[in-house]
Design a protein with these regions (language model features):
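Glycine-rich flexible loops
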Residues: 1-265
Length: 265
């Protein structure tokens, strides 16, 4: 089978296109990393293009010891979500994590290109989430419009932000009962924001970067995108009300919901 016809490739390409159409992946915005299963790794190793291509090795400036030997599908630095479907061999790559480097074994235009600049944040988040859930597969970064807008209108405090979200819709506490993580504003890219995001990911599946976007993680594309959609939809409700929430679920009702579905003690 053509490597691009594998279901996880098709899902990744479809997700990128969807994010652009939703307005969450403008210009170079957005990136994703998908952890391949053992079965998927074996399929990739048996691909003829992979067999005949010598890996390109690039240095790794951070530690991800618990991911050594793991394979990831990654978007490239500078990729446009809008056009990934037109040239996936350039905009996507498969990498293998080593102790202090990564091997590009497929894609990125035969290893010429490089993984997203937020690759360190991605791998550190995978490492954090796998400790909480061994089935975690995906980390996505995007710029959901109303969620970003809400960070201008709401206090930058993750507990207060979470409680506001939970009050807006019964689905919120059911979809993210652990709450939402939030960082203060930080410089994006390869710096301190990566370890700080990963630290939040030890508890939360979504971490909001104020005035920028969010990182989200999950066990599948459906799981992760559904999580993002839920946050974004209710941020939109908040902004449509001008941040002036007079009614909504009470704290007791939120607790009742969570307990009814076995999410809280």
């Amino acid at each position: 089978m053509n490597i691009l016809k594998k279901p996880f490739f098709e899902e990744a390409i479809e997700a990128c296109r969807y994010f652009w159409e939703a307005g969450w992946g403008e210009n170079h915005a957005g990136n994703l990393t998908y952890l391949l299963s053992d079965e998927q790794v074996q399929e990739i190793k048996e691909d003829e293009d992979v067999k005949k291509t010598a890996p390109t090795q690039i240095a790794m400036t951070f530690e991800a010891k618990e991911l050594i030997g793991k394979y990831f599908l990654v978007t490239r630095a500078g990729a446009f979500f809008r056009t990934i479907h037109k040239h996936p061999e350039k905009d996507l790559g498969i990498v293998k994590v080593n102790e202090d480097s990564v091997d590009i074994i497929w894609g990125f235009e035969n290893g010429i290109m490089r993984p997203t600049s937020e690759f360190p944040a991605h791998l550190l988040c995978h490492q954090a989430r796998l400790k909480q859930n061994p089935e975690n597969r995906l980390v996505m970064h995007c710029h959901p419009t109303h969620t970003i807008a809400m960070t201008f209108a709401h206090e930058i405090d993750e507990e207060k932000f979470t409680r506001t979200m939970w009050r807006l819709n019964s689905e919120c506490v059911l979809v993210f009962p652990e709450g939402l993580g939030m960082l203060p504003w930080m410089v994006c890219g390869e710096g301190a924001i990566g370890p700080e995001t990963a630290r939040k990911m030890e508890k939360y599946r979504i971490v909001i970067w104020p005035y920028h976007g969010m990182f989200a993680s999950g066990t599948s594309f459906e799981d992760t995108i559904g999580l993002i959609e839920t946050v974004e939809k209710n941020a939109q409700v908040y902004m449509l009300n001008g941040g002036n929430i007079k009614n909504g679920l009470t704290e007791d009702q939120v607790k009742e919901l969570a307990q009814a579905f076995g999410l809280w003690d």
